[in-house]
């Protein structure tokens, strides 16, 4: 069995259920055991730094690649820091807004959401005769400590999460922002089309390589765990890739192995199966 020296973990749908910040007890125990065995454990996530920090209360990590590789931290040291340029930032935020796409701007200090999104969900709830959508969004915003866009102070943006009422609206915005790629999420939450900007200067795979270079580990001696399309660059960069059982089909087909779901304690079981525990 290969002796993997570095472990990379996606958060949403891998370490935790999507939109949550409390990992299963079994996953925390597995991380602690792997670190006792001398392995380095890193988060590799689309979340900005502020949104991943709640995870740091549950387990010790050796660092993280936040914002899909836009910010890489090893220990207390910034290894890579590459937000959007002011021009890119202004362009993408304006294009999305002009096309009626709701935005969550992710910065190092926090995530800022369009206030109009709640009004949109409230109207959908009235139409559907329930309060499910608004309760769902309010719970996510509270768990992830999101803030309203009116509080955004202009700090550098690393990525923008998009939630569009229709695919047509999102397609128009994407066509106007040719300087970016967009990763479409393969989970349609409440019939909304979800996507995230992808900066062509980096991705999760670059995050893996940056971390490995900083700690002197060959990427071939790393293993990663993910569940969705934005994890594919990470799958390609690490020596071995594992997709969660709850992951999308494209991610499962791209991974070297598939483990049980988050809900079934898949991460801890996979750590044991691949000899990562002390």
PLM-predicted stretches and their roles:
Residues 2-6, 24, 194-278:
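Mg2+-dependent phosphoryl-transfer enzymes with acidic/Ser/Thr/Gly-rich catalytic loops
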Residues 22-128:
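Active-site phosphate-binding/coordination module
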Residues 38-42, 61, 158-160, 220-221, ...:
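Short active-site oxyanion
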Residues 52-56, 173, 251, 267:
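Hydrophobic packing residues within well-ordered alpha-helices of enzyme cores
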Residues 59-60, 68, 176-178, 237-238, ...:
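Short, structured coil segments at secondary-structure junctions
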Residues 61-69, 182-185, 241-245, 259-261:
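Short hydrophobic/aromatic-enriched beta-strand-loop microsegments
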Residues 106-225:
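Conserved acidic, metal-coordinating active-site core of Asp-based
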């Amino acid at each position: 069995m290969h002796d993997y020296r570095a472990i990379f973990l996606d958060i949403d749908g891998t370490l935790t259920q999507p939109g949550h910040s409390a990992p299963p007890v079994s996953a925390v125990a597995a991380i602690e055991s792997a670190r006792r065995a001398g392995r380095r454990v890193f988060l590799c996530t689309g979340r900005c730094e502020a949104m991943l920090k709640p995870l740091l209360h549950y387990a010790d990590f050796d660092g993280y690649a936040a914002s899909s590789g836009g910010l890489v931290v090893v220990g207390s040291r910034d290894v890579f820091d590459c937000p959007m340029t002011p021009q890119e930032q202004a362009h993408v935020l304006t294009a999305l807004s002009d096309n009626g796409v709701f935005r969550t701007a992710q910065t190092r200090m926090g995530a800022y959401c369009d206030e109009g999104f709640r009004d949109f969900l409230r109207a959908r709830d009235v139409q559907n005769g329930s309060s499910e959508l608004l309760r769902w969004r309010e719970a996510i915003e509270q768990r992830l400590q999101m803030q309203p866009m009116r509080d955004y102070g202009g700090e550098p943006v690393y990525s923008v999460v998009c939630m569009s009422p229709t695919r047509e609206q999102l397609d128009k915005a994407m066509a106007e922002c040719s300087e970016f790629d967009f990763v479409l999420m393969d989970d349609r939450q409440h019939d909304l089309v979800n996507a995230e900007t992808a900066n062509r200067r980096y991705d999760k795979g670059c995050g893996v390589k940056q971390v490995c270079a900083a700690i002197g580990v060959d990427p071939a001696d790393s293993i990663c765990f993910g569940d969705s399309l934005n994890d594919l660059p990470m799958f390609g960069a690490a020596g071995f890739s594992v997709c969660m059982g709850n992951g999308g089909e494209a991610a499962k087909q791209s991974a070297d192995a598939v483990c049980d779901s988050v809900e079934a304690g898949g991460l801890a079981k996979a750590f044991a199966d691949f000899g990562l525990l002390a």
